[in-house]
Amino acid sequence: NGEILIDDENISKIKSSWQKEIGYVPQKIYLMDDTIKNNIIFGDNHNNYDDSKLKDILKTSCVGNFINSLPDGVETNVGENGVFLSGGQVQRIGIARALYSQPKFLILDEATNALDTNTENQILENLSNFSKKENLTILSVSHKQNTLDYCSKIYEIKDKKLNSLK
């Protein structure tokens, strides 16, 4: 439990325009019983849908090859809470959703914990490159060392203290 503060003010009290600048990928991704595409562009104005942006995001989140193998591609229905998908596929769709909204600040909360090591490393490398290209700041919460290898700064919370490790 906790809260996110910006200038000592709870983020829930800040204008929605500010909130749109922040993306979040939780450990447990919720997917609607809808298409992959609608789960990714969820929350975005459908009038602003951009197919080329979606394709770039699918590549960055390593979900493009999986989607291209499906007969209906991004129009494939995922079932209630992603029942037709693996945990790793659901996580990659969650990452794609967060990136599609084009935040300036992205929080990854154990966002790659259901991925195999190779896919995880590829996504982390892609996110590192994406963040440089898009001027995106990423805060990654993780217990895995390989996740931390892609971070420019590392902090550890220990005994209620924040310690800089890198």
Where are these regions (language model features)?
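Catalytic Walker B motif of ABC-type/P-loop ATPase nucleotide-binding domains
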Residues: 106-110
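ABC ATPase nucleotide-binding domain helical subdomain, centered on the C-loop/LSGGQ "ABC signature"
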Residues: 3-7, 19, 37-80, 124-127, ...
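A short, proline-enriched helix->beta-strand linker immediately N-terminal to the Walker B motif
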Residues: 100-104
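Hydrophobic anchor residue at the start of the ABC signature
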Residues: 95, 141
